[in-house]
Regions:
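Phosphate-binding loop of NTP-binding sites
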Residues: 2, 21-22, 58-61, 70-214, ...
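Residue-level detector of alpha-helix initiation sites
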Residues: 11, 73, 111-115, 275, ...
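C-terminal helical cap/extension that packs against the catalytic core
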Residues: 39-41, 357-412
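Residue-level signal for inorganic ion chemistry
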Residues: 20, 66, 107, 136, ...
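N-terminal leader/targeting and accessory segments in enzymes
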Residues: 1-91, 95, 270, 382, ...
Length: 445
């Protein structure tokens, strides 16, 4: 019996453990942190051996194959030992892909992943297809393959997940864009991060499709290096030669594999960045074969994604918008670009090698104030203090929202769009967004 060790017992690790057990492997799960009770119960229910708070090196190094949580960097000591030994290390997605013939619609990119993924799932589900949502959002792909298999999966993939995928094949691959992000995990080398994102195209055949933003200079440059066999499906904001998705004369248009159009005004998502998300999603659904009536309806009634330009409400005359998912500078740029009122920008957190020059002009144009929110705000002071905009320095969400109240005038918008990861002060991005929403709503009580 082959031995599989799973490092990390979160959503992906626990799910992979269940599938490995079902497929007859000897399974051992190890997590350096404390494992959540629901994942302990899931593993106990399937008689899976696990440990928390430490790694039993002897057991781990005895594995025939290791499934690694995407949150564990390759520099981790245990990963280094496994690599030195030559033990294969894969991702949960790679493992799950071995045990299903379902059609895989996979989405990656520095920005827009979650919105595009959620929109595709919304449309395909509305069409009555047997579809699962997996990857960065939804349930573990491996757990679904083991217990509730579907004919289609819509999967949001981070660069960390793609790093350990080798034979997995995306039937429809979407690359929304590539901008600097997570460079701390890629030796601060942009090419390393780019190579990870481009892995979404690996193993594609003539039967598959690759959807990408035609105006992304990095993607178009990279494409010249790859001899892709899949159908190339570029999209752009306006009609360009070769593009099969675009906006023209106030209409949203798709030209592959069938012609589709609808009034742009009918689209539920607003803002330039959401034009790109909607074009990518529409092309994927058109390729899958969704009927045009359902496609039109899905693009029209999609409710949006929590923590992504989420309107919290208007309190004491000030609008509050939660964009906690904006964990890089590019995402913040799109958020600021969509603002139509004077904006108090909340920015800060765990910096991932950010270059803030990209947003300085927009900050000067749109912002009436900036509130820094992080354990260490020095880099923000160095970048923004000289712009001549009022700034405040805070280290908790409570103090941050209080500072926003002080700076904002009726009619202004307070925008949480941090450019950074959340782990310095919060459990995760969702915790940051929930705290912001709760404190904003308390203003109106």
């Amino acid at each position: 019996m082959s031995k599989i060790v799973i490092l990390g017992a979160g959503e992906s690790g626990a799910g992979a453990a269940v599938l490995a057990k079902k497929e007859g492997f000897e399974v051992f799960v190890s997590d350096m942190s404390k494992i959540k009770d629901n994942y302990k119960k899931l593993m106990d229910d399937h008689n899976i051996e696990w440990e928390e708070g430490h790694h039993t090196e002897e057991k781990i190094l005895d594995a025939d194959e290791v499934i690694k949580s995407p949150g564990i960097p390759k520099e981790a000591p245990m990963i280094q030992k496994l690599m030195a030994k030559g033990t294969p290390i894969i991702s949960e997605i790679e493992f799950a892909g071995r045990y299903t013939d379902a059609k895989m619609i996979c989405i990656t990119g520095s920005n827009g992943k979650t919105t595009t993924t959620s929109l595709i799932y919304h449309i395909i589900k509305s069409a009555g297809y047997d579809v699962g949502l997996a990857g960065n959002i939804g349930k573990s792909l491996a757990l679904q393959v083991a217990e509730t298999p579907h004919k289609y999966y819509v999967i949001e993939l981070s660069s960390f997940q793609l790093d350990n995928m080798y034979k997995f094949r995306a039937n429809v691959a979407i690359l929304r864009n590539i901008t600097p992000d997570h460079l701390d995990r890629y030796e601060f080398k942009m090419q390393n991060y780019t190579d990870a994102k481009m892995r979404i195209t690996q193993n594609q055949t003539e039967e598959d499709s690759f959807i990408f933003w035609n105006d992304d200079p990095i993607v178009t440059k990279e494409l010249a290096k790859y001899n892709l066999k899949s159908h190339l499906c570029p999209f752009s904001e306006f009609k360009e030669e070769g593009c099969v998705g675009f906006i023209e004369d106030g209409k949203y248009k798709l030209n592959f594999p069938s012609d589709f159009e609808m009034p742009q005004a009918d689209m539920s998502l607003r803002g330039k960045h959401n034009i790109y998300n909607s074009l990518a999603a529409g092309l994927a659904c058109n390729i899958v074969g969704i009927d045009h009536e359902t496609l039109h309806k899905g693009l029209s009634d999609f409710p949006g994604v929590e923590h992504r330009l989420e309107k919290v409400g208007k309190f004491q005359g000030v609008y509050y918008v939660n964009d906690s998912k904006a964990t890089n500078v590019d995402a913040c740029w799109y958020a600021l670009e969509s603002m139509t009122t004077p904006t108090i920008l909340i920015i800060g957190g765990k910096d991932k090698g950010n270059d803030y020059n990209q947003i300085k002009d927009l900050v000067k144009e749109k912002c009436a104030g900036i509130v820094y929110l992080g354990a260490d705000n020095q880099k923000l002071h160095d970048n923004f203090d000289a712009l001549g905009i009022p700034v405040r320095d805070t280290h908790s969400m409570k103090d941050c929202v209080a500072a926003c109240q002080e700076l904002a005038k009726p009619g202004d918008t307070v925008l949480l769009s941090p450019c950074c990861a959340s782990f310095d002060l919060f459990k995760n991005m969702e915790d940051r967004g929930e705290q912001f929403k709760a404190l904003a709503r308390a203003i109106g009580e």
